[in-house]
């Protein structure tokens, strides 16, 4: 049988292509599981296994990433992690490289929120061109909220102060707890059936992510999107953001701000200004969402090509060698100690007192030499490991930055090697050991 040379893989080539395939196809993922086999060697990296009732997966979280974790992981703890699948090529093992870790609970809600936001954005529910404008003239406002909460009091107070002529129709609903999202959906559908108001204000006061969870319902998002009436979302405090905020035609940071947005102070000019500001805010949110998605994609590409990945692989290998060396030395020391004890016992059984004393002195001398030899061996091994670590650091492309060199890239992030590839007026970025410089080309000098 003739085997084509180009079809024969080496083990290293196969492991490398499997790593590229996994990293390119899966990208970043969220994963939940129970911690086991947690270890933290002297390098500062974390190694652990995440498991459930049927499967387990090896994981690594390198120093620099794990410093952002607000708690110390322990075996048996349920966690939620974000990371990327990779292959540890020396062994051919696939593993998860963890970037962020949270205790199971709030972290799971946050992950569900991000997943739903990405899904609805892909479906077009956040698209700016589908937003309904605020009416030119607002005479009657429908308020969807709890009739006994602080939000309705704030809204009524602002409307009375700014424009007492505006009428208010309250659609009472639950705004927290199981089934609250269904109540809100029914209120939106009722208002669209009656068509008795010019605009709807969906609002409630602030609270935790769990308190506001009913506003992150996929069904509610579609109800807001399908509404004939313009909907203004004013949920929580300024720092709170919900799915309803992204789908609504206009988002106000607080209930009071929503009321101010819909009240005109008797001025048509202010109404137009408020509408323009609201559209600008939505446009910025849409732009920021697109930029965020682009940055995530770029970060994933950088992670796959980052030379730090090779350093991490070598650092992980050094950790394994350190553990194996320590274990080997301990086994040899235990073996020699056991042999010494056996010889001592034989001498005690068969030798007279004087011979026993001489042999005991000899054994003591041999024991000291043995310990000295083992200590010398351990010191040599540690020196060798230090040399390997120093050699690894010296070949890092980033090490040249500490010697005064720099790396210059064009606006697209490509490394520049020829001045002729740029034009006068182009923007370039120069990376130094600490920080970077953004500059513009004013003159190009040939070689």
UniProtKB/Swiss-Prot annotation:
It holds the Pfam family Exonuc_VII_L. It comes from the Bacteria. GO terms for biological process: DNA catabolic process. The keyword Nuclease applies. The keyword Cell membrane does not apply. CDD domains: ExoVII_LU_OBF. GO terms for molecular function: exodeoxyribonuclease VII activity; nucleic acid binding. It is an enzyme of class 3 (hydrolase). It is found in: Cytoplasm. GO terms for cellular component: cytoplasm; exodeoxyribonuclease VII complex. HAMAP family: Exonuc_7_L. NCBIfam families: xseA (TIGR00237). Heterooligomer composed of large and small subunits. PANTHER family: EXODEOXYRIBONUCLEASE 7 LARGE SUBUNIT. Belongs to the XseA family. This is Exodeoxyribonuclease 7 large subunit.
């Amino acid at each position: 049988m003739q085997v084509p040379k180009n079809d024969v893989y080496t083990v290293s080539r196969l492991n490398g292509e499997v790593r590229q395939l996994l990293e390119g196809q899966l990208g970043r993922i969220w994963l939940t599981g129970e911690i086991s086999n947690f270890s933290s060697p002297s390098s500062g990296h974390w190694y652990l296994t995440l498991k459930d009732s049927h499967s387990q997966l090896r994981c690594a979280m390198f120093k620099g990433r794990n410093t952002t974790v607000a708690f110390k992981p322990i075996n048996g703890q349920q966690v939620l992690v974000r990371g990327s699948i990779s292959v540890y090529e020396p062994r051919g093992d696939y593993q998860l490289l963890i970037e962020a870790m949270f205790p199971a609970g709030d972290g799971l809600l946050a992950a569900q929120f991000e997943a739903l936001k990405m899904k609805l954005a892909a479906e077009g529910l956040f698209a700016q061109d589908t937003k309904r404008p605020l009416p030119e003239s607002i005479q009657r406002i429908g308020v969807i909220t709890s009739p006994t909460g602080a939000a309705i009091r704030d809204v009524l107070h602002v409307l009375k102060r700014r424009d007492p002529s505006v009428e208010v129709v309250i659609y009472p609903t639950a705004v927290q707890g199981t089934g609250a999202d269904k109540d809100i959906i029914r209120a939106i559908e009722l208002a669209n059936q009656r068509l008795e108001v010019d605009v709807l204000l969906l609002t409630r006061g602030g609270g935790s992510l769990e308190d506001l969870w009913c506003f992150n319902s996929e069904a509610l998002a579609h109800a807001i999107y399908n509404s004939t009436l313009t909907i203004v979302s004013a949920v929580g405090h300024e720092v709170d953001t919900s799915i309803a905020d992204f789908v609504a035609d206009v988002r106000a940071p607080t209930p009071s701000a929503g009321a101010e947005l819909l009240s005109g102070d008797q001025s048509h000019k202010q109404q137009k200004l408020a509408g323009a500001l609201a559209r600008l805010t939505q446009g910025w949110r849409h732009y920021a969402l697109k930029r965020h998605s682009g940055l995530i994609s770029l970060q994933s590409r950088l992670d796959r090509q980052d030379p730090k990945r090779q350093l991490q692989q070598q650092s992980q290998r050094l950790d394994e060698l350190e553990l194996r060396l320590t274990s080997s030395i301990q086994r040899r020391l235990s073996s020699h100690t056991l042999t010494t004890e056996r010889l001592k016992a034989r001498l005690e059984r068969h030798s007279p007192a004087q011979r026993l004393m001489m042999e005991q002195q000899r054994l003591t001398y041999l024991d000291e030499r043995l310990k000295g030899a083992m200590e010398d061996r351990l010191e040599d091994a540690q020196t060798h490991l230090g040399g390997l670590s120093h050699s690894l650091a010296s070949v890092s492309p980033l090490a040249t930055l500490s010697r005064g060199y720099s790396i210059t890239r064009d606006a697209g992030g490509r490394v520049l090697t020829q001045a002729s590839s740029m034009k006068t007026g182009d923007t370039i970025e120069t990376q130094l050991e600490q920080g970077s410089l953004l500059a513009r080309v004013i003159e190009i000098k040939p070689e």
